[in-house]
Amino acid sequence: FYNLGDDNMNLENKNSFFLNSALFFSTMGSTATTLGFITYIFNTTHSPFNTGAVTIATLLVGMLLGPFLGILVKEKGLMWSMVVPEIVSGFILLIFVFIDNLYLVYIIAFLIGFNNKILGIARLSFIPNITNDLVKFNALLRSINRFALISGSLLFSVIINYSLTMVFVIDAITYIISAYLLYRLNRNVKIQSHSTISQKTIRQSIYDRIQLLIKGYKLLFL
């Protein structure tokens, strides 16, 4: 007999495999990219401040835009929010390979940080479509993330012995692989939102995020 439950289970397993594999390749590439940028800037400027600035450029995205990116994910949809940022990250890295410019590094670092933030929000939004056990699945994602961080560091340490340019080329490839895996996810998925949230306009949502951000900064600094 035809069993719809088996089909759902197979779909969940496939989505889990694609999402976890994409996370691994994306995080591995991001780690190697960050180390590559740090190496490039230090070798070019020999300045600790300039070297640290590339990390600041990446983290700045989360601090300034983090509260608003959830709105973008909701408006654009999960597939757009996961696949497009990975493709963009891959291509802008390849641009840097052909255009060797110090200031371009900071722009690319900011853009990749922006893309990774959107991807992270969309990934978390997709999890309820795979499993109801969010605690275990989030623990699995964290384990994969840590393994990818180690793998990215090892990847960088091996490839840097041959060429820094090759680091960025291979990193770009990992982003494209991640985009392909995310593209293979079930596309018939929409972000589940509460009715009170869905009834809000974009302007109201942005205003709420700004108020929340201001309140958070007051708690931190006042």
Model-assigned labels for residue ranges:
Residues 5-16, 188-222:
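Juxtamembrane intracellular "pre-TM" segments in multi-pass secondary transporters
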Residues 9-61, 218-222:
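Helix-loop boundary and gating motifs at the non-cytosolic
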Residues 18-34, 58-71, 79-89, 104-160, ...:
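Substrate-agnostic recognition of the 12-TM MFS/MFS-like secondary transporter fold
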Residues 33, 42, 93-96, 112, ...:
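MFS-fold secondary transporters
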Residues 38-43, 151-170:
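Transmembrane alpha-helix termini and helix-breaking/packing motifs in multi-pass membrane transporters
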Residues 45, 77, 99-100:
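Helix-breaking motifs and short loop linkers at transmembrane-helix boundaries and internal kinks
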Residues 87-100:
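C-terminal ends and interior cores of transmembrane alpha-helices
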Residues 125, 129, 168, 172-197:
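Helix-loop junctions on the cytosolic side of multi-pass membrane transporters
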